[in-house]
Regions:
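Glycine-rich beta-strand-to-loop/alpha-helix junction loops that act as flexible
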Residues: 6-7, 146-151
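DPxDG-like acidic metal-binding loop motif
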Residues: 2-30, 46
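Short, surface-exposed acidic
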Residues: 25-33, 97-99, 144-147
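Short, active-site-adjacent cap segments at secondary-structure transitions
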Residues: 1, 152-154
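Conserved, helical-rich catalytic subdomain that frames metal- and/or nucleotide-binding sites
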Residues: 45-143, 156-160
Length: 160
């Protein structure tokens, strides 16, 4: 995949459409709970949050207020297999999180996060994706952040 949540957003959209068309009257919270059983990040897309810190496999969604960012996305012609990236993460890279650093990161706006932390610190999946797809290093440019399980990178565009 590209690491932009395409499959997850499609799944969440289907759940919302089914809820509406079948008159199920499920709440957003109920849709998020179903989404967490469907796949990674489906809960986030079902939440309708504009900005959120997402953890676990996307089932923990903590919203926050932040102005929309002007970003640029680059997707190299490398298809990263989401399941394999997560499996490699669990096998080789899973470690206990530094809770002090996590709290610091939660308190910062996105622009500061990108300025102050490395690609590896911002996305735990970058290292396992690199292990599986070493050619990603050709595209890991300064100022660009790895998106999801890959293969896209994004950066915050300078205001002009």
């Amino acid at each position: 995949g590209a690491g932009l949540g395409g499959g997850s957003s499609d799944s969440a959209t289907f759940l919302k459409m089914l809820n509406e068309q079948a008159c199920l009257n499920l709440t957003c919270k109920e849709l998020m709970e179903i989404g967490s059983r469907v796949g990674a990040d489906v809960s986030f897309f079902a939440s309708e949050a504009l900005s959120a810190n997402v953890s676990g496999i996307g089932e923990v969604v903590e919203t926050y207020q932040e102005d929309a960012l002007n970003i640029e996305v680059f997707t190299p012609k490398i298809a990263c297999h989401t399941g394999k990236v997560y499996q490699t993460y669990r096998e080789y890279f899973l470690q206990t999180m530094d809770t002090n650093q996590a709290q610091k990161m939660l308190s910062l706006p996105s622009t500061k996060l990108v300025e102050q932390f490395s690609k590896e610190e911002l996305n735990d999946l970058f290292a396992p994706a690199r292990k599986l797809y070493p050619e990603l290093l050709l595209y890991a440019k300064e100022g660009w952040v790895f998106s999801g399980s890959g293969s896209s990178f994004f950066r915050i565009k300078e205001e002009v």
